[in-house]
Amino acid sequence: MGKAKRVPDGNPTGGSNQAKRDGAESDGPAVSVIDRIGGPYRAVARFLNRRALARATRAIPRTLHYVGSALLRGEVGDSLPAPHLSVGLAAQVAMDEALLAMAMTPRRFPLTRDYARVARELAEAESMYLRQGWITAPHSYHRAPPPLSHSDVSTSRGWAMGHGYDRWDWDSGFAPYPDEPGADRWMAFKTNRTATATVVRHPGQDPRPWVIAIHGFCMGFPFMDFQGLQMHRLHHELGMNVVLPALPLHGPRRVTLVSGEPFLSFELMNAVHGLTQAVWDIRRLITLIRQQGATSISLYGVSLGAYAASILAGIDGGIDAVVAGIPVSDFPGLFQSHSPHDIRARSIEHKIMGGPAENVFRVVSPLSFKAKVPWNERYVFAGYGDRMAPPEQAQRLWEHWEQPRISWYAGGHIGYLWSKQVTDFLVASLGRISTVRSSAMKRG
């Protein structure tokens, strides 16, 4: 199996020479159909992609397309509720589109040789997973981690956003299976081997409800997560102890300047290992929380964190409630929807998409697991105008969860932060479980 060269900017594929990007490679098609047709188009695209403002202008036609489609069809999808169009919604759509365009820098684009290598990794993973029976029985892919005890954790104090907190650090202990594609690359991320979580708890030893709040992509720091996950509401208004774990390669575990950058890249096996490790680390964290006399344990995640929370809701039988906010539920589908046309076409040509990726990601898809959380304690919220985690992603999770309570707000991906509707929904959802379980503990 070919190994990727790691480079300082976090692109594990290596290489910035433009000739490499354009030249044919021995392990891929010498001159493909895409090469012949798309050459002039790619030259113009590369010129524009190097300029941040030029990339940001893509938001204008994309926003107009969204508004026009919604006006013509009266809906954002065949089975999705009709959006309530407004200037505010259009502005949030434009914000999402601009952020997406700005994120698509040239160094995030794969080299020509990367397609064959990534395709080979996925094909090898698919073959291995089929032999082991993991694709048909995804539960069996996830090993039960050892419990976490206080003696395993080092604690330090910190301060962010006007609030003190404890920081827990421990050895993750996670490693991919031997000979699993991408395992060596993943284990080379040394800072990722230490798991970490921010803990905000009430003084005293009284039993309390706990919530594990899981951040999204590019987050993982207290000053971001406290606001992004509404820690103050959960802690002060609902009286919960709040734990905010850092996902693999995020926050203190990052290996590049951008938090989480290698997690969501063209190295698709990174996402498989990252999600598997996230589940492993949080399951260990849950064992420690249970030792604290928790009256209930809830999961709340946004975006990428909602994806992880949704997997955990189908694996761990001791979760009392789960809230999936602006969730992702289909990684290969998300990759295709956000990839430029050229990359998408080449990925299909090299048989990365359209079979292998979809099969491999079954082992880390929330749609592969039947939720163990009670139906009336499953909650979803999503935005009509979300361009980062499209509404169809939330719709699929909601349907897979047998259509529990869902709240659709008129906004984009980050619009939930200033949506009173979302805040009220979150407080009502987690407030219910914390009140019920706390009352039951007192009566007992």
Q: Would you name each region that the model predicts?
A:
Residues G2-G182, R443-G444:
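N-terminal targeting or regulatory segments adjacent to alpha/beta-hydrolase or S9 domains
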Residues S310-P356, W408:
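Hydrolase active-site cap/lid region
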Residues A213-T276:
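Cap/lid segment of the alpha/beta-hydrolase catalytic domain
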Residues V373, V380-A382:
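Short beta-strand/loop motif that positions the catalytic acidic residue
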Residues G301-G305, A309:
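Gly/Ala-rich beta-loop-alpha elbow adjacent to hydrolase catalytic centers
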Residues R387-Q393:
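Conserved alpha/beta-hydrolase "acid-adjacent" motif
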Residues G412-T423:
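Catalytic histidine-centered segment of alpha/beta-hydrolase-like enzymes
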Residues G293-V302:
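Alpha/beta-hydrolase fold nucleophile elbow
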